[in-house]
Every structure is written in C-alpha cells, then in structure tokens.
C-alpha cells in the first residue's frame, strides 16, 4: 500500500478554533482575533487542500476567507486574491509556508505549523516588508470537530 501524500498537511483535517495574536517587534499585542478554521481535503480536480476561515475582530467585525491548495509534486501551491505561494512539510511533520502578499506590495510572511498533542496546534507567522521583520502572529488553536 502506498502512503498518503502530504501526511503532515492531512493531520490538520477538521475544524479548529482559537486565537490569532498579532504582536509588534517589542512583543506588544497589536490585535487579538478569534478564529474558526476548517481544513478539508476535497479531492476535486486539482484541489488537494481547502481552508475556510472566519475571523472575529475585537470590534465585532467578521472577516471570511477561503483558499485552495493545488498539488505541485513536493509542495502545495496557493494563488488567492491576497497572497501567492507554497507550503511543504518536513520529514518530522512540521508544515511550512512562504506566502507573498498581493494586497501589501513588498510584504511576505513565513508560517510554521506544529501539531501538538490532544488536538492542539501552534502556528507562527513571521511578517516581512522590504526584507525587514515588522510583525509576528501567534496562532493557538484546538480541534473542535
């Protein structure tokens, strides 16, 4: 039997809830956002991975977003209205992303996703603009379904 492709990505199947905490270079909180994230593997044409996100901001406003990942051999490729880039995984189950922002010229972020135990995961985003780090985002989530 052949092993399933992208096992570290597949480990994130399900619905996740938690927080996204944006912090500045001095580790001061800029914003704390409540998150609801659905990770799916729909097996539709080229779409290998689909993520749907609902973010609730401190002022009560809600942002909905979603994106698909296309299998490109050793990585998944993303091309959305706000970013373009790829994800891949390490041999020991860490998922990495490098995404160029379309909505912020000169900006990109690198994301590290680490699966914990008991249905928990940690994600960190390192934001760069014109080559300089300017923000980090700390995502703490738990699987709810």
Please place each PLM-identified region on the residue numbering.
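A short, Trp-centered hydrophobic/proline-enriched beta-strand micro-motif
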Residues: 15-19, 121-123
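Central antiparallel beta-sheet cores of small beta-barrel/beta-sandwich binding domains
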Residues: 20, 27-110
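Edge beta-strand at a domain terminus
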Residues: 114-116, 124-145
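Short, surface-exposed linear segments at secondary-structure transitions and domain or protein termini
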Residues: 72-78, 118-122, 145
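Flexible, membrane-facing loop/turn or short amphipathic-helix motifs
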Residues: 23-30, 128-132
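A short, structured loop/turn motif at beta-sheet edges
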Residues: 10, 41-46, 88-91, 114-119, ...
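Exposed beta-sheet edge/beta-hairpin loop segments within beta-rich domains
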Residues: 7, 99-104, 111-116, 128-131
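N-terminal helix-cap/turn-to-beta initiation motif at the start of protein domains
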Residues: 1-15
């Amino acid at each position: 039997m052949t092993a399933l492709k992208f096992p570290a990505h597949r480990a994130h199947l399900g619905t996740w809830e938690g927080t996204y905490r944006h912090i500045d270079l001095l580790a001061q909180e800029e914003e704390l956002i409540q998150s609801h994230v659905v990770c799916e593997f729909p097996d539709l044409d080229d779409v290998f991975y689909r993520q749907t996100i609902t973010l609730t901001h401190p002022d009560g406003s809600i942002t909905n977003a979603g994106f698909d990942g296309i299998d490109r051999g050793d990585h998944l490729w993303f091309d959305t209205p706000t970013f373009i880039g790829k994800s891949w995984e390490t041999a020991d189950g860490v998922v990495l992303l490098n995404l160029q922002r379309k909505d912020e010229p000169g900006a990109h972020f690198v994301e590290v996703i680490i699966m914990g135990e008991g249905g928990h995961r940690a994600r960190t985003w390192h934001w760069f603009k014109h080559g300089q780090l300017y923000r980090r985002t700390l995502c703490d989530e738990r699987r709810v379904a």
